[in-house]
From Swiss-Prot:
<feature type="compositionally biased region" description="Basic and acidic residues">
    <location>
        <begin position="494"/>
        <end position="508"/>
    </location>
</feature>
<dbReference type="GO" id="GO:0006629">
    <property type="term" value="P:lipid metabolic process"/>
</dbReference>
<protein>
    <recommendedName>
        <fullName>Increased rDNA silencing protein 4</fullName>
    </recommendedName>
</protein>
<keyword id="KW-0443">Lipid metabolism</keyword>
<feature type="region of interest" description="Disordered">
    <location>
        <begin position="292"/>
        <end position="315"/>
    </location>
</feature>
<feature type="domain" description="EH">
    <location>
        <begin position="508"/>
        <end position="604"/>
    </location>
</feature>
<feature type="region of interest" description="Disordered">
    <location>
        <begin position="487"/>
        <end position="529"/>
    </location>
</feature>
<comment type="function">
    <text>Positive regulator of phosphatidylinositol 4,5-bisphosphate turnover and negatively regulates signaling through the cell integrity pathway. Involved in rDNA silencing.</text>
</comment>
<comment type="similarity">
    <text>Belongs to the IRS4 family.</text>
</comment>
<dbReference type="InterPro" id="IPR011992">
    <property type="entry name" value="EF-hand-dom_pair"/>
</dbReference>
<dbReference type="InterPro" id="IPR000261">
    <property type="entry name" value="EH_dom"/>
</dbReference>
<dbReference type="Pfam" id="PF12763">
    <property type="entry name" value="EH"/>
</dbReference>
Amino acid sequence: MRFRSRHQVDKPNVIVTQSNRKNEDRLGEDASLKAAQAMFKKHTVSQGFAVSDAPGTKLSLPNSGHGTPAHNVQAMARSSSSSSATSTPINIIRRSPRSSLKGKPMGGLSVSPRTVEGNAALSQQAAAVALENEISGDESIVLVPAGNSNGSMTRSNSSINAIRIVPGGGLSSSRSSSKVSIVKNSPTHSLALADKLNSITLESVYGKPSTATGTATRTLAGRKAPPAAFIDQDSVLSNDKHSENEDTPIKGTISYDTTARMNVPVTYEGTLPDLIPGHQRHKKKKWRNIFGSSATHGSSAGGAIGINGTSASGNDQYENPSGTLSELQLNRAEDNLIVKSVNPTQKTRLQTTLRSNDYDRNSELAAVAGGYSSDESAFSSDSDRELHYATDNHHNNSINNHSSGVYYGNVGGNGVYNGGTAGVGRTKHRAMVRSHKRKSFNEDKPWKSHVDIGYISERERKRYEGIWVTNRNSYLELLPWWNQPLQDEEQEQEQEREMDHESQHGLEEELEEEREQESGQGQEQDADIPEDGLMLNLIVMEIWSRSNLSNQLLGQIYDKVDTRHDGTLNRQSFLTGMWLVDQCLYGRKLPKQIDQRVWDSVDKFVISIPNNNPHHRHRRRKKMLRKELKTIKKDLKT
């Protein structure tokens, strides 16, 4: 840092380096307070102030949170003695490098301490406020004396001396309000405070964990120390017990961004650097707006996890880049910074697949149960990509489920997308989906696609008639009685030739009588042959045998439908026989006698008419009558 006097306007008072380190703790502030006290001591001594440890004054600095931004920092000092000394006003000017470059006006605060001891205490308080702004890198505070125009506070012993910091005109600050109280106690407290400050070095307290809850920790490793000339002049810093060459390990949540900004080479032992910083989504997902986000999701999405296992809350989860729980050790001899992992078993696991497993969840739970936690698992895989992939799948599945009626339920709080780590703890439950598609005809199980109506349907009759038309009137000449009329005609012609020589008168009369008799018999045979034709019994058995039924069963069917008894079947018999073969294939028994409506359904159209008194109702009536008769008989006997 470079310093200037109050009268110089061209040069800035304090040059604060801008940094993104947000890991701070209370002990780090107390250690840096010592350097700030020495800095303000140099300024206040030249103006007639004594900046030293005030006897009877105890200084406590609560940690300043970053949850809600504010612009005012108040410090309250209560006097316990009845001193009526005159007050000397002091101006603490809060200056920002940005505002000084742009020429913006700066705000100030007025301090009216009661006594010289009060001035020293308030100087320490101003140093704490200056250190707070120095760490943030946004603004700086300079303590200068002011005239009486700013106003002096003259009140009773119970009055309150307030320090009020007003930011420069229009300058927006993102620091939150922190209240610092100054309580005057016995001199033993001030001595204990002085011993405590003298025993603490700047480097030995940077890495100590913070005891405050709900705020993110901030490491001071890598921050430039004050100039050596200034440290030599300071009596407090020169009397440190620990030497500068002593290497003190620092434990804390350290990110790769922090180590990359250091001007020393870094050696990683036992772990890999976090090459993937904490990614912040620009907009939330729709399902997160509806169902919200849980703590486990916040930690996996880049939330900061402290050393004691508590996760950071508020907006710091997305603002703080998480790091690996590591131990820093500065080797001054070799000018090298060594980064070691606290837990040797913790190793960076890189993502190899988009499939989710239970290993990530189990390791995270084991780490929390063991009292330590690491954000290494959050960067071992691209959690943002997994969440994006999972949310896209969930959106597509929800659309398909609305159309198909499939419901995904929740079991044990782990639903389809619970508020946990991406790809962990999900259970999908699919309901049984039954398709209503019409199945094709199964030849092995034909009875499943058949409805028994007790007669030949129109569809079945058309199928049977197609077979009849293609095979009728075939091979009928094999029958013994089919060619007999032709042979009789040839014999008659031969007899006529022999009887030519005989007398024509007597013989003609006899021949006419014989011809009349033969013609009558031929007409009777022609009348027996139907117009639809006939089918030979050999062809019938060949067609029916393709059903793989036994020959005995096929013979029984043929005997039931044969009405001619001459080795042929007419149309009605053939269609009825085909229907009986199908009924046997459907698994039904062969009836003893064929119903008349089956014969009628071959040549006629069957129309189904609803029956008002079906057969099963008649049976019920008979049973009811029998029960009534039994009850009547019992009544008569009694």
